Amino acid sequence: MVASNNMKGLRAFISDLRSLEHDDEEKRVNVELAKIRAKFQSSTLSAYDRKKYVSKLLYIYMLGYPITFGHMEAAKLLSGTKYSEKLIGYLAVALLLNENHELMKLVINSIKKDLLSHDSLQNSLALHTIANIGGRELCETVYYDIYKLLMSASNENIVRQKSALALLHIYRKFPDLINPEWFEPIVMILGDDDLNVSLAVSNFVNLIVIREPKYQKFAYGKAVGKLKNIVFEHGYSSDYLYYSVPCPWLQVNLCRILLACERPSDNPTRATLIRVLDRILSLPNDNSNVQQVNAVNAILFEAIKLAFLVDESHSLYEKCMDRLADMIADKESNIRYLAFETTAYLISCGHSITSLKHYKELILSSLRYKDVSLRKKSLELLYMMCDEENAKLIVADLLQYLPHLDSVTQEDLISKVAIISETFATDYEWYVDVTIQLLRIAGKSADDGVWHQLVHVIVNNEEIQEYATKRLFSLLQSETIHECLVKAGGYVLGEFGHLITDYPDSQPVHQFSTIYRKLNVSSPSTRVLLLTTLIKLANLQPELNDRIAKVFQEYSTIINPEVQQRACEYLQLLKMPRDFLQLVCDEVPPFLDGNRDGVHPKSRPSSKVNLVDTYPQTIPNVSKPSTPIDVPEYDISACLPGFYRLCWKDKGILYQDSQIQIGVRSEYHNSEGAIYLYYENRQSNTLKSLSSTLIRTFSTFHLATTFQDTNLPSGVQLQQKYVMSGVNEIFEPPIIHVSYVTGVIRSIDLQLPVLLSKFMKPTIFDSYDFFNHWGQMGVEREAQLTFGLNSKDRKLDAKRLTKIVSGFHWGICQNVDSIALNIVGAGIIRFGTQNVGCLLRIEPNYEQNLIRLSIRSTNTSIANTLAKEMQEILRNSF
């Protein structure tokens, strides 16, 4: 708390409060608040008293008590003649007000007056307040004055430093206020002789080069020059040495600026930077001094990232690897965490870190650290290090560690191992073994999606059905097994139990007794599934019908309504004709890839037959299920083939039948677009009362022109036009309802091929620039999906895949990825008032017809939306 030494009342008040218990403290605070309120109402209140009482209010506020008065008195202190009054006034304004407070309008003039003052202390107080709570109105009033303070060489350096930070606040919140002509002069200040000013401006420059790429070349030269001045020319005084390390924060910021910039075209600048990085990577690190170690490592981490980007000759590769290896092996957990993070960053940028794979055991050992963040980061790094060569080894190691981990880390590990085993599986038996081991060791930490996917793979791959059924049945016979394995085993045994009846101890009677034992100790949801297993067993093994009927009879009186209902229904099924039971219990068909995430046995029918349609007799004493059936709001299924095709083509047929054909033509330019619909009568009779109604839309999508005549003669076309004036929100494709009369009223819902990607402007990067931007966006701004095609009969085709990606308005970047089959793209979407950069990486697996889609963007919501859109279109376009 800032207080003048002569405010004895304040000091006494603070001393009193510190000596009191909570209840007594609250009473004392309430007494003081009443006293202060009375004093503020006095007409003889002096400036000194106002300062003292506002200080008391601030202290009370900092203790956590609400302050509902005194704001005006605090604002009056800004007009005081003494520095101490202004100091308390600005502190009160910063703490008690926010940018939308009604009193902010009253303090704007005082702040502007102090900015124009020739007193550097008053300038500093005003700049502090702007940088902390500057709202739109305040920033509009003072932004030019702040710029003048920054650019004036006659001002004290402390004022210029604070001006840079205040201007950065304005640029972050209200970029439209900053004149683009100011950027180059601001970048120039990066080379200022005062390192504090350079440090303050460096944050601003970093944001400029990210938002305004055209200034990157200029900023690159300035940053390299300043870094060289510090490293080689000792352009600093002893005041800027932090434990013998020269201005480490500025060095870190300069490296980050260079990371954000494009690679320079002039070789001298690049050569200078490589020499500077070589010197930095050779810095000694005195392990006896923690502060020095932290400062040096902060610089090293940024220098290593930068070296990988600019050193095409790889002359610094060994030094980078040696320094990273030392930090990975460091005993200090913070250093090890940052080393893991840096290594993960390099991998995400496509760089090779082969030599660090020798430290796999060391990284694995971090999974047992007490620090949860280190455990999470080490697991993330191991996941990213996986490739076709080492996937099985890493999975085996992770499975060894799995039993010894806490539940949170187990859950994360299970998820990652499941993805690795599916992505890099060379044979499905290995995948089945790994997934079963995951569920056996840590089933309680596993998401249901893990065993759902196991069932999916088994059902869809005939060659492993016998092997998987035998493995799961063997586990079902053990006494202690987690319920997720019971569910998976029960499901698979019901479908494929007949495949293992020739094995010893796997005869139908053994299968029945095993399932019955598990029924008695399982949860209601598992019991429901196991009852389904028994009805399927009864279908294939008629000799067990009596035993199974007794089980159904037993569970038909159980208290749980869902289990009871299922038992009653299955008991009635056993009494029906044999051919009907066979029809109902037909083997489950292969799952479509589109449902791979939803293979829940309860939510999917085990037969292609509807019981009601097939056997209309009523079943006594069986109630209807209480769970409602979800009915889609719109039925757009008829237009989906055309919709999927037009999402990556500019024109074509959206829908047609024997009566009407509806075509589409799209035009997009930057952030605006138009979509034309063509209605054509395909029959000899006139279509009457043709209408088209927009039933789902978004804010900038609206009808521009439409047909006037609602009658459509044979062979005639009618046109309709919709326009899009930019995009400022995440949206779903619009849907129109089309109706017409041909003797009877006919109608159809059509989903229009308007996606977020349609507003993208294609961009081309070389390898350096792509992975530079890819790394800057980071894993946290990435949307990644792995999926297959919706039809098993379809095959991925490289040419068609590239054509579809290009049709999504991505700029295809050639010779960027080290794997030639991968597709890399870039684009920019004008979203509201911002240009949002987007990067794409597609890793197709043509043998298994799988696609791994990764999209990074400066806007995470846009990355997620683009990924979901592309997933749906790609899986339905082959």
UniProtKB/Swiss-Prot annotation:
- UniProt-listed InterPro entries: Adaptor_Complx_Large_Subunit, AP2_complex_asu, ARM-like, ARM-type_fold, Clathrin/coatomer_adapt-like_N, Clathrin_a-adaptin_app_sub_C, Clathrin_a/b/g-adaptin_app_Ig, Clathrin_app_Ig-like_sf
Q: What is its main location?
A: membrane
The UniProt keyword set, sorted, is:
Cell membrane, Coated pit, Endocytosis, Membrane, Protein transport, Transport
**GO terms for biological process, alphabetical:** clathrin-dependent endocytosis; intracellular protein transport
In the bilayer, the protein is annotated as: Peripheral membrane protein
Q: Which SUPFAM superfamilies match?
A: ARM repeat, Clathrin adaptor appendage domain, Subdomain of clathrin and coatomer appendage domain
Q: Name one GO cellular component term.
A: cell cortex of cell tip
| SMART domains with a match to the protein in the record | Alpha_adaptinC2
What Gene3D superfamilies does the entry give?
Answer: 2.60.40.1230, Leucine-rich Repeat Variant, TATA-Binding Protein
How does this chain assemble? Answer: Adaptor protein complex 2 (AP-2) is a heterotetramer composed of two large adaptins (alpha-type subunit apl3 and beta-type subunit apl1), a medium chain (mu-type subunit apm4) and a small adaptin (sigma-type subunit aps2).
The role this protein plays is: Adaptins are components of the adaptor complexes which link clathrin to receptors in coated vesicles. Clathrin-associated protein complexes are believed to interact with the cytoplasmic tails of membrane proteins, leading to their selection and concentration. Alpha adaptin is a subunit of the plasma membrane adaptor.
Q: Which family does it belong to?
A: Belongs to the adaptor complexes large subunit family.
Its name, as the record gives it, is AP-2 complex subunit alpha
Organism whose genome encodes this protein: Schizosaccharomyces pombe (strain 972 / ATCC 24843) (Fission yeast)
The opening ranks of the lineage are: Eukaryota, Fungi, Dikarya, Ascomycota, Taphrinomycotina
- Whichever gene encodes this chain, its name is apl3
